[in-house]
């Protein structure tokens, strides 16, 4: 097949399984090194070789986390996708710190799919949070095994040994991890009970976690050009493909194809009609050529006529009107909270506030367009692509190819941006089916920017209705929050949906954030699934998912309530962050609950001198505080945005963003800051600059000539601070996005008295608000 360009940082290896806490841990000599990993408790007394073959049946397979070579090199195996966030470095810090590794000898390896890794997904700001406990235990077990064998080689006992920087020392003698591997025979199987008793380092003894001096392990490869992204993958003899896209995402059928003009283009080979048994890809035509430039030109020259699907005339307004219809219908939906007394409180209320908030469709627009290389080799289909949810697309690929899942393997690469787009691996399907149609010949499918935007799994337009009831003394007695949008998890991963209090499944990524941490009396949260949205496009998970738009409604509404009650918005929030009842929080993930959110609010008030700073005319601060991404794993954020509004043009200029974060233990300080900066700028982009509109069933924008995300010239000053903490680390890839939009919306009101309830905010909206007084 020829030499394949693959991305590797370190040696080849393997990784995890699902219920990690129920696994034992294996240490075994293997070949020229030592492997470390978790194993099923039923096999904890056995030693298994590392399986470097294609996926097997999964029986009694260890889940391998790291290896130590005779030269002392330590390879940490990573199942999370690297898309600019340096996740490999963060996770390697955890295991290396606990094992007392020499950081200069640590390497990271991004593994390919195999059943032994269990759930492979990178999203939801989960990676560090999900890996923290298991990698600390893995590091502790590795350290223990090295000390045990090191003590034997030094002629002493483990209790007389110390270990630091990959060196075991005792009685004036020492031996390195590498020499222990080369000269000894480390082999120890830990039962789950033993694992639970292994001593873990206290925060005061950590050398790598939280160390701001360490550099990301993947920077050299990314800066010297040796890092390989999915778009770089190639093999000898492959054909290049580009899809000809139908007029609707679903239901379009090819009536005729004319390739007369395409045949005139040098390098054109043929076209293929894609028939996808999974029905994810409908009505696509793939053009094949000897070069990508030829594929682009031939696709443009190809003439295809379709019978379009039923949503050919659907608009953004139609979808939002459908959302309103669903909200106004008391039947249907799923209740996440449904306290007793909500209807009674509204029925007897002295005053009711009732507002609607809407958010537009937003595209991912990642730098690297979606692409995939597919071919069959020895009866197995290999798919080479960057992807965020390998475990989700593998069964779909198997269904599309009509082969067992064991006959499909996904090779991992760096991602030139993900932001949730590559959680949906639909772009691999036409490449795989094209290869199958050619008898397994390699096909490299690359979507152009326009292709990628046309069938992006973008953020659904949404409608929120927020109501609050007050008694005669103006005390809050109840809150009713409802939101309607397309459900990405419902469309692509139904098994991952949670159950509401009424026992019905719902998409937590289409309502999270509405279930906030404020004390508001009787509280009801209802999620509604916009069926018209899902018929029109494939809703996707976009960075910050629902908290990126639910927070717009919740936090802007709370500011409106504060102003109505003539209270300072920050002090008003503090009154509601009592940390009582369900908002108390629980160990280990939400320790402190709303009281930690309140602490973030207080610290930021001090930091920005809230309410005491004199600013020029039409310039003001606004605030928002959130607990993204989910109640089960909250990152406590608060943002103060300072904006200036030009009354003559309606242009809003964000001058400064001040963000305070309590994310528990910060594992990688530089990465944490970079993630928060990027997330905040993403939030700024979505509130002031970026959105698309659905016209005739499709996003109207196809490139940067009309799609206008944040530019460098519009980037404000940023001041980001993390509260010191030794609690379990939470996510950082998305929470910073959630607070910026509402903080800016509230700042606009404070600057010029215009309350805007649609995101994004456009100059015309500001001018209209000014004109209406």
From Swiss-Prot:
Pfam families to which the protein is assigned, alphabetical: MoCoBD_1, MoCoBD_2
GO molecular function: aldehyde dehydrogenase (quinone) activity
Subcellular location(s) per record: Cell inner membrane
Signal sequence, renumbered to the chain: 1-44
GO cellular component: plasma membrane
Keywords: Cell inner membrane, Cell membrane, Membrane, Oxidoreductase, PQQ, Signal
Principal EC category: oxidoreductase
UniProt superkingdom: Bacteria
Reactions mediated catalytically: an aldehyde + a quinone + H2O = a quinol + a carboxylate + H(+)
Cofactor: pyrroloquinoline quinone
Protein's membrane topology: Peripheral membrane protein
EC number: 1.2.5.2
PTM section of the record: Predicted to be exported by the Tat system. The position of the signal peptide cleavage has been experimentally proven.
This protein's name: Membrane-bound aldehyde dehydrogenase [pyrroloquinoline-quinone]
